[in-house]
Amino acid sequence: MPSKTKYNLVDDGHDLRIPLHNEDAFQHGICFEAKYVGSLDVPRPNSRVEIVAAMRRIRYEFKAKNIKKKKVSIMVSVDGVKVILKKKKKLLLLQKKEWTWDESKMLVMQDPIYRIFYVSHDSQDLKIFSYIARDGASNIFRCNVFKSKKKSQAMRIVRTVGQAFEVCHKLSLQHTQQNADGQEDGESERNSNSSGDPGRQLTGAERASTATAEETDIDAVEVPLPGNDVLEFSRGVTDLDAVGKEGGSHTGSKVSHPQEPMLTASPRMLLPSSSSKPPGLGTETPLSTHHQMQLLQQLLQQQQQQTQVAVAQVHLLKDQLAAEAAARLEAQARVHQLLLQNKDMLQHISLLVKQVQELELKLSGQNAMGSQDSLLEITFRSGALPVLCDPTTPKPEDLHSPPLGAGLADFAHPAGSPLGRRDCLVKLECFRFLPPEDTPPPAQGEALLGGLELIKFRESGIASEYESNTDESEERDSWSQEELPRLLNVLQRQELGDGLDDEIAV
């Protein structure tokens, strides 16, 4: 017998084209063991990325809150997906552990098949799987996350839920066909009995059976086309609300990577039950009309969202306009303040210009005598102009100023006087100005000053312009005895020096 090699080994468990379970098994239910991570309300997802992000967010939030996983049993049947809490109880009489079930107290959640929106597992962690179900009362999507022990177990659970969709779809087709056959038989009977028993209606039992069939029907009632009883098993991760018609019976879904088994949902799964439908729609409403209503509702939601966006933009523009207006007012206030400051500065500058012009006029009207006297005043200041003498000149502390008296004219030059030395580098000459003829002779104390027209000097050495030479009497009275030694060394010297290189006349 030929032995199996690695080339002819076939594992039907991973073949997506082969169903995992028998269809009759879904009537009783297929049970799986897993750990329940948690559930959260999520907005309607539009892509797989949003679903995976919601799945991971639930995991991280429950892990951050330190909420432990609960061991549960997942029951998949035609009635829906039922999650039951599994709990251990010790039986003291039997002295062993047994698993006991109490569905009334341990039921975690139960969702019918047509309300399950999406089912898949995480691509990064294949042990994690989840399904999104829609609540019938509040129409809110809720994501339930689970974790299995093995990756293959999670894949089997996902494929089982997908196969449950297909089984329910087949059952809905059978119910629809039976209802159509019953209606045809009833019409034929009414036509045959129209002559003998016209106006015959259904009895109460028939009405109750028909209503029960309509309530237990998972999908909307639609007459299927003949020759479409066989379903193609294509399991892929797809949006169960995305519907594409193929012959009017089922939809073909996109097949993705084998590592992420995908599920195909019939468009009938999307339709709510007869109790949750709008009052305007009956059980015999065509599927296209329902889709048109869904499209109109989505368009209305889109228009509302666009209106909200436009209103938000208007508010934003108003806020920007108010901010710009406030900034403009602030800028105007600053400009006004700067204009006031500039005005004050211009006034101050104009005053300074006037003062400068007045000073220029005063300086231009000053006579030459005032400038000579100013130079004399600067010369006699201590330290203003150093006198360069030979090394034999004695120090200033060795000099003794003679007292002022009547014999000042006959004062002999001391040895340390710079005016009394002929070989000094700098010599000061005294110029005598003759007074007018009709002027009375000066007093004896004023013999040294002679015809010099002295004016009062400022500290800067510049003669004040506004003081005239005619106020000689006031100027002479202002001189005190302390100011006379300043011209003590000015002598009556008439002759010139021997050379111009060693004498300077001021």
From Swiss-Prot:
Residues 494-506 are annotated as: Interaction with NOS1. Gene3D superfamilies: Pleckstrin-homology domain (PH domain)/Phosphotyrosine-binding domain (PTB). CDD domains: PTB_CAPON-like. Expressed in kidney glomeruli podocytes. Residues 26-196 form the PID domain. A motif (PDZ-binding) lies at residues 504-506. It is found in: Cell projection, Filopodium; Cell projection, Podosome. GO terms for cellular component: anchoring junction; caveola; cytosol; filopodium; glutamatergic synapse; mitochondrion; nucleus; perinuclear region of cytoplasm. The keyword Phosphoprotein applies. Residues 175-224, 241-260 are annotated as: Disordered. The keyword Magnesium does not apply. GO terms for molecular function: nitric-oxide synthase binding; nitric-oxide synthase regulator activity; signaling adaptor activity. One of its GO terms (biological process) is postsynaptic actin cytoskeleton organization. Keywords: Cell junction, Cell projection, Coiled coil, Disease variant, Phosphoprotein. Residues 203-213 have a biased composition (Low complexity). Residues 322-363 form a coiled coil. Changing residue 143 to Y: In NPHS22; loss of promotion of filipodia and podosome formation and migration. Interacts with the PDZ domain of NOS1 or the second PDZ domain of DLG4 through its C-terminus. Interacts with RASD1 and SYN1, SYN2 and SYN3 via its PID domain. Forms a ternary complex with NOS1 and RASD1. Forms a ternary complex with NOS1 and SYN1. This is Carboxyl-terminal PDZ ligand of neuronal nitric oxide synthase protein. It comes from Homo sapiens (Human). The gene is NOS1AP.
